[in-house]
């Protein structure tokens, strides 16, 4: 005070905050982090966001892409073949409660970094300490200057916690299988999504789309490549419903965000001569309502994708089938009216109906010269 000094018998606010930070319970630290994470919102193209699930049952087993934010203790570190994060992710990937998970290719995970988690926990303790001082300002009998100091430190610590959460939850874990090496063993791709001001969910979405580990637009050529590699190697067709189930289930196949991505790829491919055909069904020897090289608006999950070679052969045979005439019937004027049909060679014919080849047209007589 001017040129005079004195000793205050009360500890400084900073010393009080440091002492209180050491007394913050671990459970309170975890609760603070998870409560902030649970404010995250789902973003496209994810159909669901699941923050710190207590068990695998908390993550639905459905045919749509979902992002799982792992718990604070499920940490990962660089170049780690095994970690608490991978163990937790594998449990959710393989199980849905007490049952095996079916649609495993629909999940991706974000995990915290092991080293960064230590800094985050300390930042949370500091924040909790300053908040407790603010809550006790009446008991501590703080003056105006001290209240201003508390508010400033609380605001600073809050910003630090928010920034540290984004820095800490930086590992994107996606399951994959190399079908040319081992069709059963899951490998985990771990990539960093740190940096930037976007949310954890937005960064994960952007990273997955850039790396094509989550596909929102699929070219028909890539769909045909997957069909030829695995899905219809030993058959000429595949049901669309079954194809979509395969894509949702097996981690060696591309991960599509939702069914409409597959539907759009099929529709684009059908409007071309290069990829595949579509049929409403198969009778055992021919495809029903076979179409290709045309725009198809309505695609049903019960429809079949058909290889081009058998599709072209059937369409060519149907096109070259001879016209046939059913036994003439009486018209309203008493005359006879033949009915023409273009039937495929193998079409079943009612034996009670008499079929005739249409008569060959005769050239008209040339009139005599006068």
Located regions from the model:
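Extended alpha-helical scaffold and adjacent linker segments that couple domains
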Residues: 1-370
């Amino acid at each position: 005070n001017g040129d005079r000094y004195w000793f205050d018998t009360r500890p400084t606010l900073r010393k009080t905050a440091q002492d209180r930070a050491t007394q913050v319970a671990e459970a309170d630290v975890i609760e603070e982090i998870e409560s902030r994470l649970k404010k995250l919102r789902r973003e496209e193209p994810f159909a669901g966001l699941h923050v710190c699930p207590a068990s695998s049952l908390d993550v639905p087993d459905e045919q749509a892409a979902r992002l799982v934010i792992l718990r604070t203790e499920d940490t990962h570190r660089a170049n780690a073949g095994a970690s608490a994060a991978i163990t937790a992710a594998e449990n959710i990937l393989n199980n849905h409660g007490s049952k095996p998970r079916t649609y495993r290719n629909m999940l991706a995970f974000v995990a915290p970094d092991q080293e960064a988690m230590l800094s985050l926990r300390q930042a949370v303790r500091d924040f909790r300490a300053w908040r407790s001082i603010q809550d006790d300002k009446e008991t501590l009998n703080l003056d105006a200057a001290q209240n201003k100091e508390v508010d400033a430190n609380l605001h600073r610590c809050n910003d630090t916690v928010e920034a540290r959460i984004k820095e800490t939850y930086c590992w994107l874990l996606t399951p994959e299988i190399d079908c040319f090496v081992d069709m059963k063993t899951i490998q985990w791709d771990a990539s960093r999504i740190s940096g930037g001001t976007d949310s954890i969910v937005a960064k994960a979405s952007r990273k997955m789309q850039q790396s094509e580990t989550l596909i929102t637009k699929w070219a028909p050529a890539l769909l045909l490549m997957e069909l030829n590699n695995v899905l219809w190697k030993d058959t000429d067709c595949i049901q669309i419903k079954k194809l979509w189930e395969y894509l949702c289930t097996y981690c060696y196949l591309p991960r599509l965000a939702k069914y409409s991505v597959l539907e759009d790829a099929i529709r684009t491919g059908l409007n071309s001569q290069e990829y595949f055909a579509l049929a409403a069904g198969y009778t055992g020897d021919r495809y029903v309502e076979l179409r290709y090289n045309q725009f198809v608006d309505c695609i049903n999950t019960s429809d079949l994708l058909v290889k081009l070679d058998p599709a072209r052969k059937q369409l060519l045979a149907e096109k070259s089938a001879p016209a046939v005439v059913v036994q003439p019937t009486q018209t309203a004027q008493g005359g006879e009216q033949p009915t023409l049909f273009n039937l495929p060679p193998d079409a079943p014919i009612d034996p009670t109906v008499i079929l005739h080849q249409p008569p060959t047209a005769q050239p008209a007589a040339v009139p005599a010269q006068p």
